[in-house]
């Protein structure tokens, strides 16, 4: 299969999911609808919908159900982004002003709440006509995902005032904050098509490993990425005091003088550009390659998970492998 064929496959999924998102995210109150739909207008990679629909296709699943379930996870994802931007006080997302910057915090909180409700509405529509056990499994993993995402975000925030965060704690945090929704997406692709427990387990593991790899690369791009390409400020993780794998590794490897520079910049809202750049240089020196190698390890694990699933659709298999590889090759 050529890259053009895979691109057509992905575009078909994205267009169909976008159409359903637009139909779900409607409100009688215009301002609420605009604020809720704002981040969708800026595009986004739609990786979670691609994972869900490709996972469904992999086992010969129902496309219409998959599109609606994919809309549910993407709406849920955007809900978390709206609230994350408030918590992190970020002014840009995907090159656009964040919802709280454009409409104010009260409306942004309401928009997040509205998206949260709409995500459940979309999932409910996806599950219509299915038996009670399947309905229960799908809603259980969706609800559990929200709980674990919240716990992951809470862990991330709690790390900001610590310098002793371990790699194990970091991995646990990103499993919750980021990887859980990828895992949920892949699992739902199996659950809505009544896949057996072994298949759902392997899809779950695929999504989890892909999500861990994705977040590690996200943290890397926050240090070395291009601001215009990313659509958000670089160095914001340093300014916010985030304990990414790069910071954790650097603190364990750097000289005492380098540590002093890094610690004085971490979490310093008043840090100047040259301070942030110096801290970035120290991080690149000590942890950039390590972080890339770690991301590749989890990307490889995701691909390995796919080898244990009976395949009904070769295109979907290639798509899922590509998505795992894309996580470590992307520039935004």
UniProtKB/Swiss-Prot annotation:
Mg(2+) 1 binds at residues 84, 88. GO terms for molecular function: geranylgeranyl diphosphate synthase activity; metal ion binding; prenyltransferase activity. Keywords: Lipid biosynthesis, Lipid metabolism, Magnesium, Metal-binding, Transferase. Mg(2+) 2 binds at residues 84, 88. The keyword Signal does not apply. GO terms for biological process: geranylgeranyl diphosphate biosynthetic process; isoprenoid biosynthetic process. Pathway: Isoprenoid biosynthesis; geranylgeranyl diphosphate biosynthesis; geranylgeranyl diphosphate from farnesyl diphosphate and isopentenyl diphosphate: step 1/1. Isopentenyl diphosphate binds at residues 45, 48, 77, 94. Its cofactor is Mg(2+). Its EC number is 2.5.1.29. An all-trans-polyprenyl diphosphate binds at residues 93, 177-178, 215, 232, 242. SUPFAM superfamilies: Terpenoid synthases. It holds the Pfam family polyprenyl_synt. It catalyses: isopentenyl diphosphate + (2E,6E)-farnesyl diphosphate = (2E,6E,10E)-geranylgeranyl diphosphate + diphosphate. Binds 2 Mg(2+) ions per subunit. NCBIfam families: GGPP_syn. Catalyzes the condensation of isopentenyl pyrophosphate with the allylic pyrophosphates to yield geranylgeranyl diphosphate (GGPP) which is a precursor of the ether-linked lipids. Belongs to the FPP/GGPP synthase family. PANTHER family: GERANYLGERANYL PYROPHOSPHATE SYNTHASE, SHORT CHAIN ISOPRENYL DIPHOSPHATE SYNTHASE. This is Geranylgeranyl diphosphate synthase. It comes from Saccharolobus solfataricus (strain ATCC 35092 / DSM 1617 / JCM 11322 / P2).
């Amino acid at each position: 299969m050529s890259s053009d064929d895979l691109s057509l496959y992905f575009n078909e999924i994205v267009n169909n999911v976008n159409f359903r998102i637009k139909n779900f995210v409607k409100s009688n109150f215009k301002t609420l609808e605009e604020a809720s739909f704002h981040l969708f207008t800026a595009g986004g990679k739609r990786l979670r919908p691609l994972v869900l629909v490709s996972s469904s296709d992999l086992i010969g699943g129902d496309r219409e159900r998959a599109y609606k379930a994919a809309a549910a996870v993407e709406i849920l994802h955007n809900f978390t982004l709206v609230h994350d931007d408030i918590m992190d006080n970020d002014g840009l997302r995907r090159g656009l002003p964040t919802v709280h910057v454009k409409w104010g915090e009260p409306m942004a909180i309401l928009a997040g709440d509205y998206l949260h409700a709409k995500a459940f509405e979309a999932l409910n529509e996806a599950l219509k006509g299915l038996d009670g056990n399947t309905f229960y499994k799908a809603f259980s993993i969706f609800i559990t995902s929200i709980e674990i995402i919240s716990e992951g975000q809470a862990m991330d925030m709690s790390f900001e005032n610590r310098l002793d965060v371990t790699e194990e704690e970091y991995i646990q945090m990103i499993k919750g904050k980021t990887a859980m929704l990828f895992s949920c997406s892949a699992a739902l692709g199996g659950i809505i098509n009544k896949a057996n427990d072994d298949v759902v387990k392997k899809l779950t593991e695929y999504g989890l490993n892909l999500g861990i790899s994705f977040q590690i690369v996200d943290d890397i791009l926050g240090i070395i990425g291009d601001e215009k390409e990313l659509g958000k400020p670089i160095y914001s993780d340093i300014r916010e005091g985030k304990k990414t794998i790069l910071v954790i590794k650097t603190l364990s490897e750097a000289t005492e003088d380098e540590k002093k520079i890094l610690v004085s910049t971490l979490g310093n809202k008043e840090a100047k550009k040259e301070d942030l750049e110096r801290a970035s240089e120290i991080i690149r020196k000590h942890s950039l390659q390590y972080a890339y190698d770690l991301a590749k390890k989890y990307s490889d694990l995701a691909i390995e998970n796919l080898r244990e699933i009976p395949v009904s659709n070769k295109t979907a298999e290639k798509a899922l492998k590509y998505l795992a590889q894309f996580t470590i090759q992307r520039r935004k």
